[in-house]
Amino acid sequence: MKEYQTVTEISGPLIYAEVDEPIGYDEIVEIETPNGDIKRGQVLESEDGLVAIQVFEGTSGIDTNASVRFSGETLKMKVTEDLLGRVLDGSGQPIDGGPEILADERREIVGAAINPYAREYPEEFIQTGVAAVDGMNTLVRGQKLPIFSGSGLPHNELALQIARQATVPEEENADDNEDDGSEFAVIFGAMGITAEEANEFMEDFERTGALERSVVFMNLADDPAVERTVTPRMVLTTAEYLAFEKDYHVLVILTDMTNYCEALREIGAAREEVPGRRGYPGYMYTDLATLYERAGRIEGREGSVTQIPILTMPGDDDTHPIPDLTGYITEGQIYVDRDLNSQGVQPPVNVLPSLSRLMDDGIGEGLTREDHADVSDQMYAAYAEGEDLRDLVNIVGREALSDRDNKYLDFADRFETEFIDQGFEVNRSINETLEIGWDLLSMLPKDELNRVDEDLIEKYYREENAGETAEIAAE
């Protein structure tokens, strides 16, 4: 490696050095400080003999006497099946005290989006054990389904619940020698989290045994912002290897994408780039797409990469650039709701603004159950009507409502307390979720179930529940 002692400027997480040869974009750099410390960096820009380098460990201790060595290689991730059960820092180095990683291969972390022509359409169900997701906003293999949350809401608890409970149920009609649900892995990437949050994550992974099938990447709040731009790419490179080389169905959970975007803004400001909306880089949409579009399935490969990116909306504003741009790229969203959280509903998922655009392709007979779509549609309609009636009650009082309206109000209350509110430790199968759905729908008269096929009503409707509701209304 050719060595230079030509550092001319230090600006935030960046250093600038003069060179007399062409230097490649994203090339890895070693920086040796005057006291002998070695730091790693990456080339951000190279033009007219001046190179901008982002330093992973921060620029503390670096001055104009530092030595800079260019490797001629881009940043690579050591990948192997033995990564399962390991905990790494945000740049892919082990921090769990375990043995050194013996890689099967080293892969560049700047992967490409899956070729649209080679994509296989996502259509198999992933069971998260969370009724609000499985029953109402179903996740399918190869989908990218973000969770929109707010500051102080329990999105981390929801992420951990999904990480330890998520499975790919075996298809009912699968051949006996096929085990499509056996190879499932979770890659958990945390960016900009506090030490307290990191401890909570690790305690939960170890307590529940979920770590055995997981790879955990931890970038802490006091780690350099530059490392946060690397972490999700390390995560996705590992996921792609396990999915497309080792035939795993991989669920990638990234939290918090807001911290990632703040790191982009910080680096952009240090480079004196022209800012876009609210100071974020104008290329943030493209940058996010390079991450989200790495989810999917490839024809001829058994494995899949499914993404659940989690982001906190500043000021609970879903028009903020981060959730706004994320919504354009991904295939739906799950909303964590502040009002439901204040009522003690766990997890506080508001199903009305939530959406899974690929749900219809991953449910039904042979995937979940024949009545899944009808039950979901009817519960959406009934809950929405109950919500509208709550607004009316605030004006005219409940006494002014008809018996029919009171049944919808009761449905909305029980939908939140019995269907949505299951706690963070309860793992519901899809059958349990749908059975609870029928318990609630049976509060309503049969002629109100206009979104459910008559044959399904005859098969699943509980006459005794309708009778109980009538008695309560009479009292």
UniProtKB/Swiss-Prot annotation:
CDD domains: ATP-synt_V_A-type_beta_C, ATP-synt_V_A-type_beta_N, V_A-ATPase_B
The UniProt record lists the keyword Transmembrane: no
Short name of any one Pfam family annotated for the protein: ATP-synt_ab
GO cellular component terms listed in the entry, alphabetical order: plasma membrane; proton-transporting two-sector ATPase complex, catalytic domain
Chief location bin: membrane
UniProt keywords, alphabetically: ATP synthesis, Cell membrane, Hydrogen ion transport, Ion transport, Membrane, Transport
Subcellular location: Cell membrane
InterPro entries: ATP-synt_VA_C, ATPase_a/bsu_AS, ATPase_A1-cplx_bsu, ATPase_F1/V1/A1_a/bsu_N, ATPase_F1/V1/A1_a/bsu_nucl-bd, P-loop_NTPase, V-ATPase_su_B/beta
Assembly with partners or alone: Has multiple subunits with at least A(3), B(3), C, D, E, F, H, I and proteolipid K(x).
Family from the record: Belongs to the ATPase alpha/beta chains family.
Classification via NCBIfam families: ATP_syn_B_arch, PRK04196.1
Classification via HAMAP family: ATP_synth_B_arch (MF_00310)
Role of this protein: Component of the A-type ATP synthase that produces ATP from ADP in the presence of a proton gradient across the membrane. The B chain is a regulatory subunit.
Name of protein: A-type ATP synthase subunit B
Organism: Haloquadratum walsbyi (strain DSM 16790 / HBSQ001)
Gene name tied to this protein: atpB
